Amino acid sequence: MTPTELNLKAKALLETHFDDIVLSGEISKITLHGSGHWYFDLKDERSSIACAMFKGANLKVGFKPAVGDFLELCGSVSLYPESGRYQFIATSMKKAGFGDLEAQFLALKERLQKEGLFDPRFKKSLPKFPKKVGIITSKTSAALQDMLKLIHQKEYFLAKIYIFDALTQGNNAPFSLIQALKKADDMDLDVLIIARGGGSREDLFCFNDENLAREIFKAKTPIISAIGHEIDYVISDFVADFRAPTPSAAIDTLFYSKLDIEQSLDLMEEKLMQLWNYKIQNYENLLLNLSKFFKFNSLPKIIDEKIKQSHNIEKQLNHLLANQMRYNELKLDKLQNAYLQHENFFNKSKKFICIRKNGKIANLEDLKSDDIVILSSQTSQKEAKIL
């Protein structure tokens, strides 16, 4: 028996015994193919099965299924002979409520939001030109290689990259991520990226861990959450300081390319030159206006003011000189009067006679008969005897 023969027998057996089955579960991964067919995985708490719903059947469905939807399917089990892979072929589909993963996600999201862990007030700003950047992800992941390749392509050599290896899938992933986060947060980094590439809802569910969310919230380092694809949302996206839709988008957000920096510098130089020329032109206009102002307005006023000041000074000097002249004239009159008085006294004193007795000036009442005296005037003197 060949593999083809075995697969065909198994296909016939499955389609015979597993026909018209009702299957319930949660979508953990889905592809809406361009051909119109839908391919998805349906899971419960322990297992999953690949499912397909072809275009002819899904046209009757009134909604587009998504990851996390809890569905009830009708259909049969079949096997694809070329690969030997069996799958459930759905012929009808309806929603059966929230899946367990989605319910857990929404409940935790609502509780943390009420506590304020998503409040924009607590979001830290990202650095403009980071020099120390940490990346928490699996060191063997394609996402890490894509990020490092993009950094190299951007030729951003200002930053040193620190890689912190952690599990990004499975039950042990939250603890591994928390340990890596604590280690990175103690290294005084400028920014930290928590990254993982795309995957199923179940694959990404470790980033919905409550303990991880609280560690992200209390970290002192600004954190970017870059998990899955643009349509994927996890709790770490809401509690982080910034959400990037993909790991590569986180690099685009954080790092300028060499060309971007050169263009920014050129633009800054151009703006500075425009500002410089504008300032110079303003100052030139100001100087020109001031020159005109002083030339046609202020200078004549200043000259007139100085002339008025000189006239006032001249008047003050003339007044002072006139006062001094009057003072000198009065003083001269006093001297002249004093001179005339002395001259009159001198002329009168020529007629006066001085009496001396024994060489001393004597008064008339002191003289006695027979006293010998000397009589003197300004022109002569005589000896005389008192009778």
Swiss-Prot record:
The UniProt keyword set, sorted, is: Cytoplasm, Exonuclease, Hydrolase, Nuclease
What does the record give under GO molecular function? exodeoxyribonuclease VII activity; nucleic acid binding
Record-level GO cellular component terms: cytoplasm; exodeoxyribonuclease VII complex
Q: What is its EC number?
A: 3.1.11.6
Domain of life according to the entry? Bacteria
- Where it mainly occurs, coarsely classed, is cytoplasm
The record ties this protein, via InterPro entries, to: Exonuc_VII_L, Exonuc_VII_lsu_C, OB-fold_nuc-bd_dom
Q: Name one Pfam family in it.
A: tRNA_anti_2
- EC class name: hydrolase
Q: Where in the cell is it found?
A: Cytoplasm
Signal peptide (from-to): none
One of the protein's GO biological processes: DNA catabolic process
Q: Which reaction does it catalyse?
A: Exonucleolytic cleavage in either 5'- to 3'- or 3'- to 5'-direction to yield nucleoside 5'-phosphates
Q: How does it assemble?
A: Heterooligomer composed of large and small subunits.
> What role does it play?
Bidirectionally degrades single-stranded DNA into large acid-insoluble oligonucleotides, which are then degraded further into small acid-soluble oligonucleotides.
- Enumerate the PANTHER family for this protein: EXODEOXYRIBONUCLEASE 7 LARGE SUBUNIT
Q: Which HAMAP family match?
A: Exonuc_7_L
Q: What family does the entry list?
A: Belongs to the XseA family.
Q: What is this protein called?
A: Exodeoxyribonuclease 7 large subunit
List the source organism: Campylobacter jejuni subsp. jejuni serotype O:2 (strain ATCC 700819 / NCTC 11168)
